Amino acid sequence: MTTNPKPAYQRILLKLSGEALQGEDGFGIDPAILDRMAQEVKELVELGVQVGVVIGGGNLFRGAGLAEAGMNRVVGDHMGMLATVMNGLAMRDALHRAYVNARVMSAIPLKGVCDDYNWADAIRELRQGRVVIFSAGTGNPFFTTDSAACLRGIEIEADVVLKATKVDGVFTADPVANPDAELYDKLSYAEVLDKELKVMDLAAFTLARDHKMPIRVFNMNKPGALRRVVMGEAEGTLINSDA
């Protein structure tokens, strides 16, 4: 049962990890998971919520990992950006099959594949009810897709950045390694930094903090969790300036 008859947010930026798409295979894209995520996004669109999406590329390629093995970091990051484009195209296709209008915008030009990122075009598409998938990160090496999510969220004036993870939110410790770890309902930006909690990388988190962009961390694998978050129900961990 929802606590609010209307969505708590009008416009959101949903950050999905590439790993979330790979399922149990450990690599690539699981079509069943992709379709489920598309259906959950469709629910939000039907509620009248404007949805921007950023997807990581870790299910296909990780530039940082190969950089450690000797590859030039800039080259590796460029390859990682292209992986996020592939995930974005897959998500757009899944949304189209679910009868949801969606566009992929890339931070690096890929003529004939997807649209170039343009702030004004993105806002217009969102207002018209289309899902906008922001790919290729920020277009620059050395920045994560979490940074891209916060940047795009700020640019499109989203009400919140929703970071989808494999756990129920932010815990006092790693809940996988420590079953006694407790879930935080709310945190301030300062508390996250003071407690050295791993929400996202420091550059991304600082960007969100400086622009007072709320972040909610939740478990995308939990059925209905995304809808509950958007409806304002107690789900996951909310991070803002006055938690």
Curated annotation (Swiss-Prot):
One of its GO terms (cellular component) is cytosol. UMP binds at residues 57, 77, 138-145. ATP binds at residues 15-18, 58, 62, 165, 171, 174. The keyword Nucleotide-binding applies. Its main location: cytoplasm. It catalyses: UMP + ATP = UDP + ADP. Allosterically activated by GTP. Inhibited by UTP. Pathway: Pyrimidine metabolism; CTP biosynthesis via de novo pathway; UDP from UMP (UMPK route): step 1/1. SUPFAM superfamilies: Carbamate kinase-like. InterPro entries: AceGlu_kinase-like_sf (IPR036393), Asp/Glu/Uridylate_kinase (IPR001048), Uridylate_kinase (IPR011817), Uridylate_kinase_bac (IPR015963). Gene3D superfamilies: Acetylglutamate kinase-like (3.40.1160.10). Keywords: Allosteric enzyme, ATP-binding, Cytoplasm, Kinase, Nucleotide-binding, Pyrimidine biosynthesis, Transferase. GO terms for biological process: 'de novo' CTP biosynthetic process; UDP biosynthetic process. It is found in: Cytoplasm. Residues 23-28 are annotated as: Involved in allosteric activation by GTP. Its EC number is 2.7.4.22. One of its GO terms (molecular function) is UMP kinase activity. It comes from the Bacteria. Homohexamer. Catalyzes the reversible phosphorylation of UMP to UDP. Belongs to the UMP kinase family. This is Uridylate kinase. It comes from Vibrio parahaemolyticus serotype O3:K6 (strain RIMD 2210633). The gene is pyrH.
